[in-house]
């Protein structure tokens, strides 16, 4: 599981700048934490900071998310970021997705 994912992440992002590798890693980790019901608002805030303030190639992030089979998750997380911490659309690398998967993410967030 996780070792394969780490190798795939390394292969897919081998030629990408560090910023893109970091954001992609954050997304992979967020998905894992959510599956274990261990994602906190702090994790969400860190993802928000990265997406909003780090200078990265947004279209490349979308391509990476497709290669990593993370695109729907990325889009759902953008919706969560918009709803929970008010990420504006101008900072979103992709279209947010509001569906049952996004609501599941919200229900699994540890809001303390």
Language-model regions, residue ranges each:
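Conserved NTP-donor binding/palm subdomain of two-metal-ion nucleotidyltransferases/polymerases, i.e.
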Residues: 1-112
């Amino acid at each position: 599981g996780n070792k394969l994912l780490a190798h795939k992440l390394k292969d897919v992002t081998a030629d990408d700048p560090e910023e893109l590798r970091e954001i992609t890693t954050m997304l992979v980790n967020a998905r894992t934490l959510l599956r274990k019901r261990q994602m906190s608002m702090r994790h969400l805030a860190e993802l928000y900071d990265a997406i909003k303030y780090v200078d990265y190639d947004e279209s490349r992030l979308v391509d990476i998310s497709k290669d990593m089979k993370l695109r729907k998750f990325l889009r759902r997380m953008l919706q969560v970021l918009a709803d929970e911490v008010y990420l504006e659309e101008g900072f979103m690398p992709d279209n947010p997705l509001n569906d049952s998967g996004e609501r599941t993410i919200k229900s699994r967030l540890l809001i303390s």
